[in-house]
């Protein structure tokens, strides 16, 4: 026997074929959500309040400070919030201090700042009763970026951009004449020296001394028309504020507020970190030849001679001195924006581009600025300009914008913080205004603060942001993947149309950080990604992945694990996880395949710095659930990963025989299972609850503690209408530990993810029924409910106040027989357990009709019976087409009972209908390797091919689906599954480290099967064996959420479009089938004139003709002549509206009037006979318009 047994949870053992031992446990998979939100509550909010306080009025004698904040308890628990359609939130209270500096009076007060949505334990938010997920966003990190460009004449140049978190952009570029320009905030370009003069380096000589003599700077100075700081300031002011009279003072304050005001310009922590890293002098000194001697200023020791090359060793020796002041220069700008001294660090080197090697260039760094300074400084601007000139001389590197070192994640916490900042800044404006209006002596903090803008901005974010999404709850894996999704779209991100090929492509820095496989097919490919299984996000928002440290002295792999970001990893050589190690942790082979900056190289073992943690650190959680992934083509693996998320939870789930070992972790972390929070002993187990008695260890003794009650969800409707049901998997007396699974969620079995079923599959054709990937299935799977799923649909009806009086929910409905009311209770609401079909009543409701001028008889009736005789119309809730089933639950909310309802609604009734859907022809199924198909035929069991022992197989797949798709994983799974079934075991074959071909053969032989795993099959119809032996085995097949019941649709008559009078389209509108231009050609080609005529007239938009035809069919008469289509009349009206005089002439040149085209009688009839299902809103709308016109006259 190969492989070793591994325990997954309490109930499942799998034989694992992994050769590489796990050195690191998988992290909690939804940590990206929970930890980010926790940061927001602990620090993010505090940062916001510190940024905004104190708010001072215009005179400066009132000041408002935010001291502290606290969150209260949520009003309703999670489940109740969902039921009541409210937001799961807690009240935010802030302690505010108002100081009056004139009188010295201090007022403290607690102010309520609105209800704040709280994250549930599973990483979701409940907003208005719906479960939502905030997706993390991938954006460009604030920093300074340099990139090369080639103009149309083939001349090389450079561009640079300083991108802040918020504030004005600064861009540098070269032109064809080697002049360097700057753009401030996307305005017209100026020579870069204008900006330097405006900063306070007014003369040409000052600029040359600062940057260093070079031809590019000379060209730029020649182009620059300003001679001093004042003129430069005026020039910049004219660009930024065209049309306003420029003055030097205005220009100074404008430039100062644009760049040096922390409220206007923010780099954030990450921007300061990136800029300090990029503009540090050491990166540009590596491997360069010094043009000056470096001396330790304290001891006078010579560290490096002039002309010496700074290799890695020399640079490491010089580095500590660089930090401590070698090359520091203090500059005193005057006459410009900057009034304080500026500290820079500069060192002279020889230009590598100069052939003679005599040209000296100046390398300027920003002398490391503290992390607290979040705005840009003059030193940053000068260093970035210096870097740009250095690039022109071949010193420094350009940046790769798609590298994950330059892209960062904004998770929930930061997105919320940005939104909260918008609300607070709006509130700040209001506070200032109120300070100046109200009486300063009697004022309180509560009167100053208006919390509306804060609440509005939070509501707007959760309700309508592109990143706040309705959770995909089809199954636990879909839920988990949605929480780990990374999107490059959204506010401040990319748009689908503008995103090019490069952004979407797989980049080497994605390794271990973003999954190269899981991404949608279609317009979003590459823009929406998934976090890799081991990845974490650091405090700057960069994605880190873990590596095992290799000790540089001994060359052994240590137990220490370092999390590296993409740009840190670029400095190291990393070995693969499958590099062979001895027992000591030393590499066995002399030369090792390793990665360095995206290149795969073979290096000697003493050059390796790190080693991968696990082979599956490359891929995401969903991709890691595909066994034999390494044998699949990546395009098909992508489909496999995506289709697992569409698996419908089955009535009887079953974990795969051939898994990867990820099933347990995915199921546990998804949030669908019930997890034990404290160790203890199970005391009682029911369908809806599990009770666990806690115990604590005290002096080595187990002491009983409290009793914890865990409630289970039973038959709840998920966001996607699938059935969400939890069932206990522990028994009374079990000892449970913290983190253990107490109850399975949907699509789980014994704690493992179970998306489908293990079925016996044969690769063979059968009378052409599996042409084009179609699937042939045995009727056994229908009879035994193997692929039966439960679906719950929610319908609601609300009784509102209308202009004509309130609507009423009642059993007393006009023109409805007693038979239709048999299942309604005395309130007019359907009873639980009733079976309903399409069109049945669910909730009886009547709406008052518009009162017209009454006749004498009606007035008499009114006088006798009072209001009873008021006309009402039936607006009851009925079962829509295809929505029949059994009433599972009814919920009634009444305004009188104190339920919170939207304004104008008096009563709300929700009806839940449950359907049990067996698998049927037309349903879509798939394996885990992208092998998808539609069921074309369900054969009786006796007609299916059978094995020599008489067992009929369950499913037949087309063998032609394998070779061209190159997903051989399915064949290996098939063989392994068959062996596992014979041996009665479950198997774990982890990705990139699973069972090899030899393992499969050995396992087959162990199970007593032939090595090729082929069998003789007999035809179920004749009993004859088929000509060739067939591959038969167990494959894990899932039923996808694309079910034929949801797509089936038919219409006889229904709603019509208002202008063209043609039927609407689509199932949702109960529309017709489109008969387009090409279909018309087809009928013309056949010469089917009458068919064509009725399709274009009575079946579409001949208003009178279709009514007559309907009547004729009902009465059994002959169908009348078609009339003129409505769209023809619309066409004429359109031409007339363009000012053309269009007339219709008969055959004898007589003009025909539009209204002559239909008889007066027919028109009346058409009005009288309203077809069933006509769109009511449209009728009433037109009627209202007419009525308005009459009253105005």
UniProtKB/Swiss-Prot annotation:
Q: Does the keyword Transferase apply?
A: yes
Tell me any Pfam family this protein matches: RNA_pol_Rpb2_7
Kindly indicate whether the keyword Cytoplasm belongs to this entry.
no
This enzyme catalyses: RNA(n) + a ribonucleoside 5'-triphosphate = RNA(n+1) + diphosphate
Keywords per UniProt: Antibiotic resistance, DNA-directed RNA polymerase, Nucleotidyltransferase, Transcription, Transferase
Q: What is the effect of changing residue 499 to V?
A: Streptolydigan resistant
Record's InterPro entries? DNA-dir_RNA_pol_bsu_external_1 (IPR019462), DNA-dir_RNA_pol_su2 (IPR015712), DNA-dir_RNAP_su2_dom (IPR007120), DNA-dir_RNAP_su2_hyb_sf (IPR037033), RNA_pol_bsu_bac (IPR010243), RNA_pol_bsu_CS (IPR007121), RNA_pol_bsu_protrusion (IPR007644), RNA_pol_Rpb2_2 (IPR007642)
Instruction: List the cysteine pairs that form cystine.
Output: none
Gene3D superfamilies of this UniProt entry? 2.40.50.100, 2.40.50.150, 3.90.1100.10, DNA-directed RNA polymerase, subunit 2, domain 6 (2.40.270.10), RNA polymerase alpha subunit dimerisation domain (3.90.1800.10), RNA polymerase Rpb2, domain 2 (3.90.1110.10)
Q: Where is the composition biased (Basic and acidic residues)?
A: 1184-1193
Q: Give the Gene Ontology MF terms in alphabetical order.
A: DNA binding; DNA-directed RNA polymerase activity; ribonucleoside binding
Q: Which spans does this entry mark as compositional bias, Acidic residues?
A: 1149-1162
The UniProt annotation puts the region (Disordered) at 1149-1193
The EC code for this enzyme is: 2.7.7.6
Per the UniProt entry, the effect of residue 500 to R is:
Streptolydigan resistant
Q: What GO terms fall under cellular component here?
A: DNA-directed RNA polymerase complex
**Matching SUPFAM superfamilies:** beta and beta-prime subunits of DNA dependent RNA-polymerase (SSF64484)
Q: Which GO terms describe its biological process?
A: DNA-templated transcription; response to antibiotic
Enumerate the NCBIfam families for this protein.
Answer: PRK00405.1, rpoB
Quote the subunit structure annotation.
Answer: RNAP is composed of a core of 2 alpha, a beta and a beta' subunit. The core is associated with a delta subunit, and at least one of epsilon or omega. When a sigma factor is associated with the core the holoenzyme is formed, which can initiate transcription.
Family listed: Belongs to the RNA polymerase beta chain family.
Q: What is this protein called?
A: DNA-directed RNA polymerase subunit beta
